[in-house]
Amino acid sequence: MSQAVNAKKRVFKTHSYRGVDLEKLLEMSTEDFVKLAPARVRRRFARGMTSKPAGFMKKLRAAKLAAPENEKPAPVRTHMRNMIIVPEMIGSVVGIYNGKAFNQVEIRPEMLGHYLGEFSITYTPVRHGRAGATTSRFIPLK
């Protein structure tokens, strides 16, 4: 009976990015992460980082430091939808502007290498009515 219990041991998925475990990614510098990333991300970082993303990263670090132990940090709002998610941002809460409101998104390991704008949709998806010619037909009042 004890062998049956041992056989059903639960295995939890550990996240990795291009073969590198999450623990190593968190210790990794942004320059080392960029070497793992696809060409579009490498090109973007090769062109240099302006002061706006650097200021945003500083605000994220401050929010993480100010957060109590085992609590989510305060959301940091941004209009920078073209910011690429790097390992340093994992665990942060970001308010991403979609043109109307700030959508709060918690940065998870699966989001690495993607743009912030991908997680804050800018339009309302269409909800179609009844299909066919019956929609324009006159409906008499009783």
Curated annotation (Swiss-Prot):
GO terms for biological process: cytoplasmic translation; ribosomal small subunit assembly; ribosomal subunit export from nucleus. It is found in: Cytoplasm. This is Small ribosomal subunit protein uS19. GO terms for molecular function: RNA binding; structural constituent of ribosome. It comes from Saccharomyces cerevisiae (strain ATCC 204508 / S288c) (Baker's yeast). One of its GO terms (cellular component) is cytoplasm. NCBIfam families: PRK04038.1, uS19_arch. Pfam families: Ribosomal_S19. InterPro entries: Ribosomal_uS19 (IPR002222), Ribosomal_uS19_CS (IPR020934), Ribosomal_uS19_euk/arc (IPR005713), Ribosomal_uS19_SF (IPR023575). Keywords: Acetylation, Cytoplasm, Isopeptide bond, Ribonucleoprotein, Ribosomal protein, Ribosome biogenesis, Ubl conjugation. Component of the ribosome, a large ribonucleoprotein complex responsible for the synthesis of proteins in the cell. The small ribosomal subunit (SSU) binds messenger RNAs (mRNAs) and translates the encoded message by selecting cognate aminoacyl-transfer RNA (tRNA) molecules. The large subunit (LSU) contains the ribosomal catalytic site termed the peptidyl transferase center (PTC), which catalyzes the formation of peptide bonds, thereby polymerizing the amino acids delivered by tRNAs into a polypeptide chain. Belongs to the universal ribosomal protein uS19 family. The modification N-acetylserine is found at S2. There is a cross-link at K24, K35, K64 (Glycyl lysine isopeptide (Lys-Gly) (interchain with G-Cter in ubiquitin)).
